[in-house]
Amino acid sequence: MYDLLKTIDDPADLRRLDRRQLQPLADELRAFVLDSVSQTGGHLSSNLGTVELTIALHYVFDTPRDRIVWDVGHQTYPHKILTGRRDQMSTLRQLGGISGFPKRDESPYDTFGTAHSSTSISAALGMAIGSKLRGDDRFAIAVIGDGAMTAGMAFEAMNNAGVEDDVPLLVILNDNDMSISPPVGALNRHLARLMSGRFYAAARAGVERVLRHAPPVLDLARKLEEHAKGMIVPATLFEEFGFNYIGPIDGHDLDSLIPTLQNIKELRGPQFLHVVTKKGQGYKLAEADPVLYHGPGKFNPAEGIKPSTTPAKKTYTQVFGEWLCDAAELDSRVVGITPAMREGSGMVEFEKRFPDRYYDVGIAEQHAVTFAGGLATEGMKPVVAIYSTFLQRGYDQLIHDVALQNLPVVFAIDRAGLVGADGATHAGAYDLAFMRCIPNMTIMAASDENECRQMLYTALQQPNPTAVRYPRGAGTGVATVKQMAALPLGKGEVRRQSTQPAGKRIAILAFGTMVAPSLAAAEQLDATVANMRFVKPIDAALVRELAETHDAVVTVEEGCVMGGAGSACVEAMMESGVIRPVLQLGLPDRFIDHGDPAKLLASCGLDAAGIAKSIRERFVEHASGKSVKRVA
């Protein structure tokens, strides 16, 4: 099994194969991807769709000397397998294992780290120009999906690249949202070879040189060429950016891909190759439902993904989706917005029930935020459902277009804190720090499912921009209450009171997901625990009260310590003039790698045992009979 694949330890081995061996290799590679992902979990549909394209790129180009930048990067499993990581696939996305995305420190073939979309063309252009300035003759190739092409950054890069006449740049559009019928496919195969050939490029350049002295004739010739191409292929847009458009061609046909790429390799100037692929290619279940098989957990490939038979705790994403539908039922002004994350953000049911108030704006976070601001000016109640890591991309719009004008936009921030297998690129570590410094913002962190529901309702009542953050995955098992009531603004609650005498009293101020482990740690330490609820406005009165009545204060948050919720507590103490020793616990000042979420939290000292251990190490353990060390 995998006889050919076992002989490939790097692309040099691949390039030694006879062309006739490549399709059997592709079949083995596709089977290996399916087998691997079924055992580890991970992205499947997208990787099954890039097998032939990956083989063709490494076969034609001299990688890693020639650079390949994979946009988003979740489709790079075939690339990883062919570049020396075949035997490490069993560790995929696990603690200490290989990443599910390209990482520069993992392999020289991972030339640029990706995970957020639409960055590849900018990076590849920088590489291509850098290569040209150094006098190196190497290609830079950006592989970008049709979804990622909706983002403005991709077009900004193309606009920049189009004026570089001799830059060795190739942009490959991996279009998996359309299909080509066999007759059109045959025609386009011939056309792609023609358009990528040196004769076509030379003839085109020669005609332009001759006609440059007759601008009206040159303009007419260009229009005729665009019209001729436009009748067969959607070339005009990319040609307008200054690219030579080639395609579309079948991205699963090595007999089309390889000759076309070989022709392109002889050209200079920005080239644009349009390939058509199918998500889930070669695995019927994934072809039929690529969304279900986008990022599955472990499953049996012979049976496919089966619904769980054990009752599962409701996820925070489900809580949000149910709340949004309930809110829209009660108020016709509620509008739901997602930047291309309908399923991930829990908005499938909302789209079905309220299609006129559902807006998927594509991978366009900046637009999503400002679009919501515009809706708010017209009396609507926009709710932007967005992952914490992706809100970073709309930060200027959050400040300039929403907060500065004090517009009532609700931000439902999913995937706050650590996200597990997706790793550092998707971690929601920074939202508390980057939002709490913005005037007019209200920020809440949910500690359980019902509190999340009530916070979302509270946010909808506010006259200013308001954010509710909640984590990925299942909640604590708390039932949600159908009736919704607004929480007192800027007020926390004490969940546990210490019975320790003066001199040994410790107060833990916990935020969001850290309330539960803080309560568990407090049982070991007999500490007071407050569920702070609001990061902004911070409950300054509660902070002062707890500081006055306790000998030390501990803040705990699932976010970066610097500038986060703990900093807000320290600022409140300083302002009140009540100074106590403070221990701030949160995510450390480093990027947290991929792995099991519980293990990652434990490694950061943010599980119950870690919180208790940190408190004991920072302050004198109660069992010693001594008082808390007054270390400022």
Swiss-Prot record:
Cofactors (names): Mg(2+); thiamine diphosphate
Note on how the cofactor is bound: Binds 1 Mg(2+) ion per subunit. Binds 1 thiamine pyrophosphate per subunit.
Pathway linked to the protein: Metabolic intermediate biosynthesis; 1-deoxy-D-xylulose 5-phosphate biosynthesis; 1-deoxy-D-xylulose 5-phosphate from D-glyceraldehyde 3-phosphate and pyruvate: step 1/1
GO molecular function: 1-deoxy-D-xylulose-5-phosphate synthase activity; magnesium ion binding; thiamine pyrophosphate binding
Cited PROSITE patterns: TRANSKETOLASE_1 (PS00801), TRANSKETOLASE_2 (PS00802)
Catalytic activity: D-glyceraldehyde 3-phosphate + pyruvate + H(+) = 1-deoxy-D-xylulose 5-phosphate + CO2
Gene3D superfamilies xref list: 3.40.50.920, 3.40.50.970
Binding residue positions for thiamine diphosphate: 74, 115-117, 147-148, 176, 283, 365
This protein's UniProt keywords: Isoprene biosynthesis, Magnesium, Metal-binding, Thiamine biosynthesis, Thiamine pyrophosphate, Transferase
Residues reported to bind Mg(2+): 146, 176
Record's keyword annotation contains Transferase: yes
Pfam families associated with the record: DXP_synthase_N, Transket_pyr, Transketolase_C
The protein's Enzyme Commission number: 2.2.1.7
InterPro entries in alphabetical order: Dxylulose-5-P_synthase, THDP-binding, Transketo_C/PFOR_II, Transketolase-like_Pyr-bd, Transketolase_BS, Transketolase_C, Transketolase_CS
GO biological process: 1-deoxy-D-xylulose 5-phosphate biosynthetic process; isopentenyl diphosphate biosynthetic process, methylerythritol 4-phosphate pathway; terpenoid biosynthetic process; thiamine biosynthetic process
A GO cellular component annotation in the UniProt record: cytosol
PANTHER family in the record: 1-D-DEOXYXYLULOSE 5-PHOSPHATE SYNTHASE-RELATED (PTHR43322), 1-DEOXY-D-XYLULOSE-5-PHOSPHATE SYNTHASE, CHLOROPLASTIC (PTHR43322:SF5)
Function: Catalyzes the acyloin condensation reaction between C atoms 2 and 3 of pyruvate and glyceraldehyde 3-phosphate to yield 1-deoxy-D-xylulose-5-phosphate (DXP).
Subunit composition and interactions: Homodimer.
Similarity comment: family membership: Belongs to the transketolase family. DXPS subfamily.
Identification of the protein by name: 1-deoxy-D-xylulose-5-phosphate synthase
Organism this protein belongs to: Paraburkholderia phymatum (strain DSM 17167 / CIP 108236 / LMG 21445 / STM815)
